[in-house]
Each structure stands twice: as structure tokens, then as C-alpha cells.
A protein has these predicted regions:
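Active-/binding-site microenvironments in catalytic and ligand-binding cores
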Residues: 1-108
């Protein structure tokens, strides 16, 4: 079955541990794109520990870091270097719609 039609309702999707989110932050990742409904588990009582770890909230908030969840990448997109054009709606909120566009780069 195509990943475009995956039903995540009550399935317990894959998610990041707070330690994994911290690792990505320490590695220098500014814009995290993930193909699951959330970086946190479905039932976490609103703790959002992976979100908070990635953003270093509330100690040292990384206000320019972003998390884009539930992305869809077609199987035809092969691994390699890409330029990311992360377009976001001009909504002042803690969450907004985004439209990530990938442009393949040629390694010379």
C-alpha cells in the first residue's frame, strides 16, 4: 500500500526520543522534516519532549529552527544533495503551514 494512504490513527507511529532530537540540534540541523504525524508519540499527555529538546525550549529557544511534520516524499526522489526551499504561510502562531520544495543539486 502506498505511503500516501497510510492511516496513522491509533497506530503508534515512529517518533524521536528527546535525546535523538537533541542530537539533531547538536549536529546543526535547523530545519527538521519528518514523514510522520509528529516527532513526539501520539499519547504523551502534551509533554512534547522531542519538540522542546529540538527547540531547546524553554531554556534557550531556537526561534529560527523549524519542524515540518507529515511530509510526503515520493519514492522517485533518490537520496542525495538537495536545496531546500521551505515556504511558510505568513501566520503569526506557534504553528503554520509549510511547503517544502526540493531542488536536486549536481555534485561537481
Amino acid at each position: 500500500r502506498s505511503k500516501r494512504f497510510q492511516n496513522y490513527d491509533q497506530k503508534g507511529w515512529s517518533f524521536l526520543s528527546p535525546e535523538a532530537a537533541t542530537y539533531l540540534k547538536d549536529f546543526g540541523i535547523e530545519h527538521l522534516l519528518i514523514d510522520t504525524p509528529s516527532v513526539d508519540p501520539e499519547k504523551d499527555q502534551g509533554d512534547l519532549l522531542a519538540h522542546k529538546a529540538f527547540w531547546q525550549w524553554p531554556e534557550h529557544p531556537r526561534k529560527k529552527a523549524t519542524i515540518t511534520e507529515f511530509i510526503y516524499v515520493p519514492d522517485e526522489v533518490v537520496d542525495g544533495p538537495y536545496l531546500l526551499d521551505l515556504q511558510m504561510a505568513a501566520i503569526v502562531n506557534d504553528a503554520t503551514f509549510s511547503r517544502p520544495l526540493l531542488y536536486a543539486l549536481e555534485v561537481l
